[in-house]
């Protein structure tokens, strides 16, 4: 609460007749029938002025709340001149809208920040009484991690309109299941499309010719599904006696050119038999 004696008289109108922030803000709130106002703690003194203006205009006073400042990991405040710390730039980097809303809504509150993929869930979770009076500490690393975990929750319907630029055989639920656990930002699907489309020379990875010949020989007929991988690798194992890393690593390198990555059982259905044979260097 404020004692009016401790407040100076606010300037409402400049000498040239133009209006300052206070009066237009209150009138706008009245016209728009605003019932709740949440703003930074640097506006607490302004709130005292605005309540007096609401009273003077004989209007209902909204419910006011003030959230604490955002500070960096060293405990320093952010300047408005730090352009990189803006919603616009976060979105340019690839952060999902719901990630940003989730993080900044619950940072500095007693509520745990956990990945959420649905706006209704966020609304139901939010309770303004959980917001701390202490400054909220921003961590870019935590925000990045939250975005990665949020993408894991997305089903294909939630992202399909965002990947229509990919080749037709990658605009599938199987592709999304293949990459979703291995990306931090959605735009990384573009890199995985290139990885999967590339035909790698298995000789660059010192893979034995006989192994590749057997892999091609026992490759099941298409169409492929998520069970094809197990059937194929089981057949290769029976022919070669290889198992574990000795069995799976050569196939991963041939198919993706990378020593690690998503589950390959989701990769196989993205191709027909000729596509896999091409990667094996047999076409």
Each language-model region and where it sits:
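Short, charged/polar micro-motifs that form catalytic or ligand-binding hotspots
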Residues: 40, 90, 237, 241
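Active-site cores that bind ATP or allylic diphosphates and position pyrophosphate for catalysis
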Residues: 1-66, 72-78, 86
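Generic non-transmembrane alpha-helix signal with a bias for helix starts/N-cap capping motifs
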Residues: 47, 83, 97, 229-230
């Amino acid at each position: 609460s404020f004692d009016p004696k401790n407040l100076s008289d606010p300037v409402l109108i400049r000498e040239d007749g133009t209006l300052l922030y206070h009066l237009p803000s209150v009138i706008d709130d009245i016209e728009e029938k605003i019932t709740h106002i949440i703003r930074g703690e640097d506006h607490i003194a302004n709130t005292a002025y605005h309540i007096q203006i609401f009273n003077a205009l004989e209007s209902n006073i909204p419910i006011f709340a003030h959230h604490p400042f955002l500070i960096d990991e060293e405990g320093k405040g952010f300047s408005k001149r730090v352009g990189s710390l803006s919603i616009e730039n976060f979105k340019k980097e690839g952060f999902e809208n719901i990630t940003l809303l989730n993080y900044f809504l619950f940072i500095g509150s007693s509520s745990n920040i956990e990945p959420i993929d649905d706006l209704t869930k966020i609304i139901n979770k939010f309770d303004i009484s959980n917001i701390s009076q202490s400054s909220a500490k921003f961590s870019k690393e935590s925000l990045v991690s939250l975005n990665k975990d949020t993408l894991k929750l997305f089903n294909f319907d939630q992202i399909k309109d965002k990947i229509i630029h990919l080749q037709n055989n990658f605009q599938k639920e199987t592709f999304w299941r293949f990459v979703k656990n291995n990306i931090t930002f959605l735009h990384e699907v573009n890199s995985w499309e290139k990885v999967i489309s590339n035909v790698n020379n298995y000789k660059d990875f010192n893979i034995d010719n006989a192994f590749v010949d057997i892999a091609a020989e026992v490759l099941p007929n298409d169409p492929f599904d998520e069970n094809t991988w197990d059937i194929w690798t089981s057949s290769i194992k029976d022919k070669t006696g290889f198992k574990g890393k000795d069995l799976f690593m050569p196939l991963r390198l041939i198919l993706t050119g990378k020593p690690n990555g998503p589950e390959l059982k989701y990769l196989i259905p993205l191709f027909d038999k000729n596509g896999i044979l091409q990667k094996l260097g047999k076409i």
